[in-house]
């Protein structure tokens, strides 16, 4: 290198150049983001990066770059996006603060290209006890809580106890024989109750005003027989109000001679929370990405096989041309030999005429 030659630093990628690079990477992402590490896949990735660099340099208003620079820039953008999104997840989990708007468009585009590397399954609520839960209803809707069936037991003293039990179909209608369902067995002596189930699973009972509820009667049941039953409503809500699930139970009035069938009443309720959007969509998208990736690899393999076939055909054509050339040269040599022997034969014929061979020898009798 000469002494007067000065090394110039590489130019930084502008926003336009980054946009062009992201568009090209999104075009070939099924090959570039493939997780395989065998020699064939690595060679395929390198050829794809070279093709991407050729397309990139053919775009207007961009600086000339080789495929190594473009690959390094894409890796830096991907690592920076992962770091930013991880930081936002931590901040959102701790403080539920607003998201940062810096590089929002670039971050969303990169996140849409590599969702399986950025999204993850949320932690269970038990792992978030140290975080601040005093948030709005919208934040509470994003919390993943598995559905839990509870069995509420109300004894004679009015005490309430809960325990999990098997899920049974809930109904407020009477059975065919006129008996009430097994989940409702006892009348409340103090009127209607309102059960409040909070996030920690604590249950509180408060008296509420009576709401008329119509129970379905069986066709075989006699109109004179009256049974004291309780009807309850478990609202299947997507949005919780003040972190409580309200269970309204109504006790209808009946005749005075009715007696409780069992010493305790069993009330089944479902703890329904606002859940975070399901991950099934993400898993489906990941399967689609894998399917498109496999289809792209198969397409590239077909292209390679076609190129090999064309190369073999060209090789056979060249061999045919070489064989024809060799045959032509051999024919020329044979023709030259033929002409040589014809000329030699003519010379011999001129020197030794045929009539001289018919004369007798001088000493012949």
Curated annotation (Swiss-Prot):
Name of encoding gene: msantd3
Swiss-Prot/TrEMBL keywords: Coiled coil
Domain Myb-like, first and last residues per copy: 13-78
Similarity comment text for this entry: Belongs to the MSANTD3 family.
This protein's record includes keyword Coiled coil: yes
Ranges in coiled-coil conformation: 301-337
Source organism superkingdom: Eukaryota
Pfam family, one: Myb_DNA-bind_5
Stated name of the protein: Myb/SANT-like DNA-binding domain-containing protein 3
Species of origin: Xenopus tropicalis
InterPro entries: Myb_DNA-bind_5
